[in-house]
From Swiss-Prot:
TPR repeat feature ranges: 149-181, 185-218, 222-255
PROSITE patterns: TPR_REGION
GO biological process: FtsZ-dependent cytokinesis; protein trimerization
Domain of life (superkingdom): Bacteria
Keywords: Cell cycle, Cell division, Coiled coil, Periplasm, Repeat, Signal, TPR repeat
Record region (Disordered): 104-146
UniProt xrefs under Pfam families: TolA_bind_tri, TPR_21
Role description: Mediates coordination of peptidoglycan synthesis and outer membrane constriction during cell division.
Record's protein name: Cell division coordinator CpoB
Lineage of source species: Bacteria, Pseudomonadati, Pseudomonadota, Gammaproteobacteria, Pseudomonadales
Subcellular location: Periplasm
Alphabetical list of Gene3D superfamilies matching this protein: 1.20.5.110, Tetratricopeptide repeat domain
Cellular-component GO terms for this entry: outer membrane-bounded periplasmic space
Amino acid sequence: MRMCRRVVTVLALSLPLAAWAEVPVVDDNAGSYPPAGYGTSGAYAGSGASAPASAQGQLFMQLQQMQDQLSRQQGIIEELQNDVSRMKQENLERYQDLDRRINSGAAPAATPDNSSGGGASNAAPDAAAGAAAQQPAGSSQPGDPAKEKLYYDAAFDLIKQKDFDKASQAFNAFLRKYPNSQYAGNAQYWLGEVNLAKGDLQGASQAFAQVSQKYPKHSKVPDSLYKLADVERRMGHTDKVKGILQQVVTQYPGTSAAQLAQRDLQKL
């Protein structure tokens, strides 16, 4: 009887242990360290553990936007640098062209056609015929050739000195004082050259245009028209350039200005 009680007692005590052993152990964090919700230090981070990743994404986007802005600004700077380089090159070419014209025999003229400068003129007529051709309609006031030449030479010397501001003023004053001078056509042309050297494209355009308008028979007309086309191109008036160049080629064949105009037409 006593033995039966012991067996029953052992069985009663072993049943909970057997049931506990049958319950499977599930590890939700198997294979991961640290466990979810905990930082690397072991401290619990809570549900906001994903916040640092979001902040890093925003920072990356901001940096990307800044990089894009810097790239655009760099492109603008490069364009401006190219424009400045082009303008410097054009100014240098204008000065060099002016020097060539001065040094190639384009000195102050003893007659209206001795100062052809660009080589675009044909054989020069005599001084009397040239002076008559330059006089606008209705003008018959006599001049003083010696005094006119003195004023003209003084203005031209300012070009040689590269004092373009004073040269422009001097040629303007000469044309106001001696509009019918035998040197007026030359003065009008060189006024255009001086204004171009100064970078005054509007003034250069007006001066070159007036050579053919006021002195249509003057030997400077082909050169002045060709230079006018160049100025209009610089000002962006491409619609006018082709017509002016065609006028030079058609009306003044055989001149160096016509040859240059033909070359430029082929590039348009």
